[in-house]
Amino acid sequence: ADMIIERLGHSAQNDTQICYSREPSEALETGGGIHNALPLIKSDPFIVVNGDIWTDYNFANLHKPLPKLAHLVLVQNPDHNPKGDFSLRGSDVIANDTGHPSSLTFSGIGVYRAELFEKCTPGRFALAPLLHQAIAAGTVSGEMYSGRWMDVGSPVNLRAAQAKAEELIKSGS
């Protein structure tokens, strides 16, 4: 965390303010981390992007009204998650256990309303169970993204992404 703060400081280009939400010594996981950061988030809804993905997704696509509690960007299942996480029925995200034939993987890109986290207790908790509750209530929309996306959360996946990036640079893509 200190290296990120040292590198980026508290402002970026175009007078953007950067705020940091420090976690205690025990990592809070994604849900707990978002909940911990809510007092710093000035907009509702807000975008969350996992730090361990590589993508060319156009984030401007997320700048539209959000009628539900969450909107998830889903991708084709990578080798490390062949069964996927969720499915889509139109623009509604549904659970994989509904028998839907085409499961997809959560990309780590989502738009959320603070209301999704209202009943959560501060501390460590995963985002997935909270999303499953919201999906069961019909309050999560989604989209399927078919562009470039890779999970770089392991050394093997990071090396694969680096190789892909080098390949794209060489080809001029």
Feature locations, PLM:
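Residue-level signal for beta-strand positions within conserved beta-sheet cores that form or flank
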Residues: 14-16, 82, 138
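Catalytic-core segments of class I nucleotidyltransferases/pyrophosphorylases
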Residues: 47, 54, 59-64, 77-80, ...
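Conserved beta-strand segments of alpha/beta enzyme cores
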Residues: 17-19, 69, 139-141
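Short, conserved catalytic or adaptor-binding loops enriched in Gly and charged residues
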Residues: 9-14, 87-88, 133-135
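Basic phosphate/pyrophosphate-binding loop/patch that engages nucleotide-derived ligands
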Residues: 11, 39-45, 55-89
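Conserved N-terminal catalytic core of the sugar/cofactor nucleotidyltransferase
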Residues: 1-50, 119, 171
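Short, surface-exposed amphipathic charged segments that create phosphate/polyanion-binding patches used
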Residues: 33-36, 85-88, 156-160
